[in-house]
Every structure is written in structure tokens, then in C-alpha cells.
Amino acid sequence: MTRDARAGRRSLLAGAGAVTLALALAACSSPGSSDSGSSGGGSSGGGGLPDTIKIMDINGLTGPVAFAGSNAAKGTALAVEQIEADGLLGDTKLEIDSKDAAADPQQAASFASQAIADPSYAAILGPSASAQSAAVSPIVQQAGVPTVYVQSGSEGVVVGDFTYRLTPPAASYYDIVGDYIDDQSIKTASVLFNAGNPTLAQLGQDTVPALLDEKGVETVGTGSVEVTAQDFTTSASQIAGAKPDAAFLLLTGPQYPVAIGQLKQAGFTGKIVGFSAMGAGNLTSAGQTAAGAVWPTNFTADQTDESSKTFVEAYEKKYDGEVPNNYAAEAYDRMWFLARGIAEADSADRAAIKDGLKAIADKGFDGAQGHVTFEDGDARVPGVLVEWDGTKEILVEGGS
């Protein structure tokens, strides 16, 4: 599929048009004034904003989502530092109150309830695990507390005008794999997906089969595994036996090294196409065994958008050369999105921030993930195609 054809399919997502980072910041630096609300901070620091705006960050810093949570915390910290230095909110300071909910939905909901009951909190940075977010969203929506998520790809997260998600659904940019299918002359494919993960199940049952059908690729086998599976020998043998040109593996990050290794051991020599969970260092243990695997993603440190390059440079400077991953990029964009909404509202009042976020979502903005637009509270980005070269992920030329 050509870039123009993809653009046509996405025309409904691009209504706001491109907004450069500098212009977006300038627009948000001088929002129209409004009456200050009672929530979110103390005495006024000028205009409609208080001296301090308090935000609860419900994160997973321990447990199975700690890898995502710790990287998200770094992206958030960088964004806060830049927002305050930029003067987007004048002299107002952002106070981020971090709460570790690990992977416990009940704990996440409890923290959200605390923020709801305490008017000093202006907004919430929601958890990244879908089960936690689905537990939080109904109560924050009913209470009217602006809450912005990353990850959390399941249904029941973006449930109304107080909830947003800055991780675009994988299905919304998976079509960029179409050009790779054409370039590699892929005519047959097998599909293996994690049936216990809603996002992966959707990709495996709907998105990928539809793309293969559109490209005229014959699906010679489809299989599924459980959410915690770590033995793929049966599936690998079946895929290798069918000898497809490509195997589409839609799995969780920790599953990929094992699945790819067992697939290669079974004699498979075709192309391997995956999902963004292949990134963020998850193929490091597979090394050269996984070389050549490709996947579409919402962010890679090598993408060419100016706003992405600016983020990567700032992140590496702050964290001693560490290369940012998608978790950090999404959290960075989330914090900037919330800050822009607050600036637009010129108020720490929860309802005013909700209206400010809508105004920013309607316009879109340039961030770490490139140009970000929204559809019904869900972020959309063009996406990029990346490849594992055996030691690191690299941008596939023309893969956007």
C-alpha cells in the first residue's frame, strides 16, 4: 500500500492538520483566561493558575509491569522538567505524586478514589495495565477527574470525555506492514497470537487476517497460545511444516525470544513479522537468532520526525546516554498533553481541564511519537516499521 493510499484510509484521523511543536507551545502559552476552580492547587501564581498543580501518577513500579512503569516515570520526569523550564504554565509548578499500584486493579482503583476525594488533585496519570485502567476509568469518569493513560489497550479504558489514552491502538497503524509484504513478495503466511491478551487477540483474529486478505496473501495456518505460554514447540512445528513465506507472531514481549528460537529450531526460514512488544529491548536475549524480524510500532529512537529527534536528544542527555523506548515516549507525550490542556484551560479546575484537553485533542500536537492526533479520546500516530538487526532495532527505510 502506498503512503498516499494509507493517508486516504486515515483521512478521518487527520482533521486537525499538522501543528509544529513550536506553534503548539506558543498557542498554549497564552490561553484565554477563565475563572480558577477549587481543585488542583493552592493560591494563585498569576492568571488563573495556582502556584502548584498536583497530579496523581498511578504507576506500576514493582511487579510484572515494572519495566514499563519505570521507563514511563523517566518520560514523565523529563516532560515536567521541560514544561516548567519552557514557561508553558507560567510560574506554576507541577507536583507529581507517584503511587505504586504494581499490577493490582483494586489498589489502582483505591488510589484513584483517594485522588477523587482530595480536591487538591487536578488530574490523574492513569496506570498502564489494562485491568487496572478498566477498574479506574468508570469511577474517574463519573467523578469528573481528567485521567490520561498509556498502554492499557483493552476496551473499557477510554469511556468518556474525562479519559484519554496516549498509546495508539496497534490496529490503527498496523497497515504500514502492507508495503513490507509487497516488497518481500510474501504470498503465504501463518498467524500465531496470544489469545489471553485483548490487543493481541484483536490483531490475530481481525487486523492481520484483513491485511493479508487485502494484499492477496494466503493464510496457511492460524493458531493461538495462552497468555503466559512459554513453550511454543507445537505451534513452531506446525508453522515450519506449512512453510509459509512469513510468520506473524502476535505475542507479549517476554514470549518473543522463546517463540522465535523454537520456530528457528523447527526449521522455519521465512520472514517473521510481529508487534510493538518486540521492541523495548525484548529481543536482546534472542540476539542473532531473531535478526531480520520486523514489527510496526508507534515509536523508535531512530524515527525522523523533528519532534521525535528533539525528545531522543533530551532524553539521552538527561539519562546519561540511555536510549528511550516507547514506554518513555508515550509517558512524555501524555504529560505534555495534560500540561497543554491545563494551559488551554488557564485553570486547575477539573472540568476546565477536561475542556482544555478536548481543545488540544481537536488540534493535535507534535511529540515524541511524531504528530499525534486523536479519535474519540484515543491517540493516533503514523507509526514506523522497525527491524531487529541482531543487536538493536533499526528503522526500515520507507517504513512509515
Predicted features and spans:
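Bacterial signal peptide processing site
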Residues: 29-32
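An alpha-beta-alpha
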Residues: 163-224, 246
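Extracellular/periplasmic periplasmic-binding protein-like sensory domains
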Residues: 262-332, 393-395, 399
